[in-house]
Amino acid sequence: MANELNSLDIQEILSLLPHRYPMLLVDRVIDFTPGKSLHAIKNVTINEPIFTGHFPNQPIFPGVLILEAMAQATGLLGFKTVENRSENELYLFAAVDNARFKKPVLPGDTMHLHVEFLKERRNLWKFAAEAKVDGKLVCSAEIMCARREF
């Protein structure tokens, strides 16, 4: 079949990322190309624990959690890129540059996370990342992850 997508369901995501509720911020991977790019989604619901305090009468998904969701997507791309990875391997959020927040993310939104691998040097991986809602850019950043064994 031409143009078949490489996708990951929640069970596959749980097998790759160490994050768990309430910090697992990727619900599904729609498509990925190892060593190149990944497209994932995060469904934002009013049931997110953060909305009890951010903000009680005007819930807005925090920008730092948008960045974390994009970082988790980069970790998934890293794990799917490296062959023969160690069971004790993690991708740690190492840096964020040029972060820009364009629109708020609200309960009911589906964030589409797009990450693109840029380069790797000495186990530091650099990615371009974007989050979109309804096709509109809500956040963009360059993210660096450190590949480490524990």
From Swiss-Prot:
SUPFAM superfamilies, A to Z: Thioesterase/thiol ester dehydrase-isomerase
UniProt key word Lipid biosynthesis: yes
Job of this protein: Involved in unsaturated fatty acids biosynthesis. Catalyzes the dehydration of short chain beta-hydroxyacyl-ACPs and long chain saturated and unsaturated beta-hydroxyacyl-ACPs.
One Pfam family per UniProt: FabA
EC number: 4.2.1.59
GO BP term, pick one: fatty acid biosynthetic process
Record field: catalytic activity: a (3R)-hydroxyacyl-[ACP] = a (2E)-enoyl-[ACP] + H2O
Family named by the database record: Belongs to the thioester dehydratase family. FabZ subfamily.
Keywords, comma-separated and alphabetical: Cytoplasm, Lipid A biosynthesis, Lipid biosynthesis, Lipid metabolism, Lyase
NCBIfam families listed in its UniProt record: fabZ, PRK00006.1
Protein name per its UniProtKB record: 3-hydroxyacyl-[acyl-carrier-protein] dehydratase FabZ
Annotated catalytic residues: 54
Protein encoded by which gene: fabZ
GO molecular function: (3R)-hydroxyacyl-[acyl-carrier-protein] dehydratase activity
Broad class of where this protein is predominantly found: cytoplasm
